[in-house]
Amino acid sequence: MSQQLLEELGRRQYRTDIPEFRVGDTVRVGVKVVEGNRERVQDFEGVVIRRRGEGINENFTVRRIASHGIGVERTFLLHAPRIDSIKVIRQGKVRRAKLYYLRGRAGKAARIRERR
């Protein structure tokens, strides 16, 4: 009984405005940020290095290189209300499900071919 209840509650939280994207794609995620009494949308753009989970618990990790060559990774719940938008900037062609090897690479070595 409780499993059915959890699934029903989860179905209400599902988002329908999520574009189709895969590991290796470059995406721009708009995240709602609360500062004091106002709320704004902050964009986080990078390469999807991982997708995992299913249903309401599905999440993905985006990696980007910030200033001075520091790598920054953020993990987002796919159906989270804090996510304002997800836009696919470019589609990458990769042969792995998890791109953890990008953590050890920088510059041209971290490039991903574009999917046609």
Swiss-Prot record:
GO terms for biological process: translation. GO terms for molecular function: structural constituent of ribosome. It comes from Chloroflexus aurantiacus (strain ATCC 29366 / DSM 635 / J-10-fl). GO terms for cellular component: cytosolic large ribosomal subunit. Belongs to the bacterial ribosomal protein bL19 family. This is Large ribosomal subunit protein bL19. Keywords: Ribonucleoprotein, Ribosomal protein. Transmembrane segments: none annotated. SUPFAM superfamilies: Translation proteins SH3-like domain. InterPro entries: Ribosomal_bL19, Ribosomal_bL19_CS, Ribosomal_bL19_sf, Translation_prot_SH3-like_sf. This protein is located at the 30S-50S ribosomal subunit interface and may play a role in the structure and function of the aminoacyl-tRNA binding site.
